[in-house]
Amino acid sequence: MNQTRVFLIFAWLMVATLLWFEWSRDKAAPAQPAVAAQTAAAPAGSTVPSATAAVPANGTVPAAPVAVPGVTQTPRTGAPPRVTVNTDVLRLVLDGGSVLQADLLHYPQSKTPGSGPVRLFSEDPQHFYTAESGWVSNGSKAPDHHAFVPENGAGEVALAKGSDSISVPFVWQGPEGVTIRRTYTFKRASYEIEVRDQVVNAGPGTWQGTVYRQLLRTPPQVKSGMTNPESFSFNGATWWDGSYQRRKFNEDYLEDGRVNAQVKGGWIAIPQHHFFSAWIPSADDTTTISLDTPDNGARALIRAMGPGVNVGPGQQATTTARLWVGPKLVDKIHAINAPGIDRVVDYSQFAILALLGQGLFWVLNFLHGFIGNWGWSIIGLVILVKLALYPLSAAQYKSFAK
């Protein structure tokens, strides 16, 4: 037996051992506890961070003051004031600083005629999944993600025919003369939502605050099975802190700590088999990424805290982030233009294998451009891979023949 055969056998044994370890760990993982039935979203106290993030001494504040029309905040009594937004690809329900429901109109839940669209964000306690954003402050009043109210009142709006975008404004009026106007902007044929917060200080004192953006989800109960692609997909939280990181939704979610990673130009995301959601702060913003398990561990949370602003009297500051709610379309993901965001496609946890997977997909996509059929494109890719590996296979057969 020559050295090549020994190496191949050793490599095969190593791969088999690693696969067995991973299978054993997943098989032994207990089911996540179900969330008790409820009619409202998660309690405010369970998902609002404490104001521990440092606020910079000098925020991004323009010199000239900007006048803002006075806004009276409506008390939160009875049903919360919500706005339903319809675009050509999305239907969303906004409740202040939260996106409580998101339907992907071009993706039916099943092939059954009349099947409803895939619902990525949901208030259903068993499938609870939402994106939230609010503010915290050490010494001043600040709005959490429940405090914003629609500036034009509750109701339903739609992207008009011939229009490329639609904006939906929310507002919070603080008791100290501080107004925060939040504007959601939706674009045609886009799953990317711009979320812009404008802080205007008409009060006598300096206002300091830090914005937080988070994704909260009840971990899905995935049934194991050879025909269920979800059982082979990564279900957990991912983020970029200078390198690609991820944690599975299981009992180990917080085993390695709550992260507390500070990064400039990072992002947070929750991917699943075909779709994902992500908060992408501005490239120049510094955020602190952390994990949590609120509601007694029944839900998993990933949060990006920051940036902080310091707004003097008569001044204003603005912070903008993007919220992605949609499918894993490679060309659209590349257009997001954020470092490492293409890793949400989950070619592999390991960078070298992810690079290989990206290369194979590029070849597959190239073949599809010529052939026009995914089935034949896959067959063509397999043939090309076989041809590329032919010299190695030939050497292996010659070795076995000896």
Predicted regions and their residues:
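Soluble non-transmembrane domains of integral membrane proteins
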Residues: R82-V344
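Hydrophobic alpha-helical transmembrane signal-anchor segments
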Residues: N2-K27
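Membrane-interface amphipathic helices and adjacent TM-edge segments
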Residues: V199, G314, V385-K402
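Juxtamembrane extramembrane loops of integral membrane proteins
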Residues: I9, R25-D124
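Hydrophobic, aromatic-rich alpha-helical transmembrane segments
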Residues: Q3-F7, I371, G375, I379
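Interfacial/capping segments of alpha-helical transmembrane domains
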Residues: P30-A31, I333-L355
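Hydrophobic alpha-helical segments of integral membrane proteins
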Residues: Q349-I371
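Hydrophobic alpha-helical transmembrane segments of multi-pass integral membrane proteins
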Residues: A11-A16, W376-L387
